[in-house]
Amino acid sequence: MAESFVRLEHVFYKYEDTEKYAVKDVSISAQKGEWVALVGHNGSGKSTIAKLLNGLLFPEDGLIKIGHFVLSEKNIWEIRRQVGMVFQNPDNQFVGATVQDDVAFGLENHGVPHDTMVERVESALNEVGMQSYALHEPARLSGGQKQRVAIAGVLALQPDVIILDEATSMLDPRGRAEVMETIRIMREQEDITVISITHDLDEVLFADRVIVMNKGEIHSEGTPKEIFQQADAMREIGLGVPFIIELQEKLVAGGFETGSTVLSEGALLDQLWKLNSNN
């Protein structure tokens, strides 16, 4: 098995104003190109992990490694060159007068030559489907469009890892779907590792692997299907399950045979059709 590209080993962290650990003995790994979702309530430690991964915070104990670099004061800029972050509120991320200016901002800070910058901005906007908005003012975009531009700004820097820190929590369902589809396509094309920090259980279904956080510790880990087959355990910590899982539970409770657990409405319809056709 290939060595993990992102690795946390026995990481501890607590904020200065509290004695309680925000992250307690957490070990997480992610392969190159893998999508890992961290899910949990507010205060579960998931957003603290996002800040630790980008070097915004340093662990009190334990090791964090991105690629070939261990997080330290010496390697902080090497880490940040490899890790891009998309935050919760897109309005807090814009600094340019136009969409293309905003995407170019990070490249300017990195001293990227102008010709290369133009190519990267165009490529990144094309990748997120926003090239036709290049000269628009960011303030005039919808929430979903703003987050796609924020993702383009990160993509232009060509990171190995993108962290989505509650990146869809302020969006309506349409905007959320736009952003998730953008991330899905981006990961397939660029082989980027995605770490999504979320409390949106439907968003978790896009991930290859899910890590459930509770009170600063890892509660459970597995594929989305494995995690949501443990519906009662999720409810015990107050998280619940996605709508598609609830629907299957209600069908079973009503006496319908649904077969194995599936994670999309289309797959459920196909399964119900096949079962009904055989009766």
UniProtKB/Swiss-Prot annotation:
Keywords: ATP-binding, Cell membrane, Membrane, Nucleotide-binding, Translocase, Transport. The keyword Translocase applies. Residues 6-240 form the ABC transporter domain. It is an enzyme of class 7 (translocase). It is a peripheral membrane protein. ATP binds at residues 40-47. Its EC number is 7.-.-.-. Its main location: membrane. GO terms for cellular component: ATP-binding cassette (ABC) transporter complex. PROSITE patterns: ABC_TRANSPORTER_1 (PS00211), ABC_TRANSPORTER_2 (PS50893), CBIO (PS51246). It holds the Pfam family ABC_tran. Belongs to the ABC transporter superfamily. Energy-coupling factor EcfA family. ATP-binding (A) component of a common energy-coupling factor (ECF) ABC-transporter complex. Unlike classic ABC transporters this ECF transporter provides the energy necessary to transport a number of different substrates. PANTHER family: ENERGY-COUPLING FACTOR TRANSPORTER ATP-BINDING PROTEIN ECFA1 (PTHR43553:SF24), HEAVY METAL TRANSPORTER (PTHR43553). Forms a stable energy-coupling factor (ECF) transporter complex composed of 2 membrane-embedded substrate-binding proteins (S component), 2 ATP-binding proteins (A component) and 2 transmembrane proteins (T component). This is Energy-coupling factor transporter ATP-binding protein EcfA1. It comes from Listeria monocytogenes serovar 1/2a (strain ATCC BAA-679 / EGD-e).
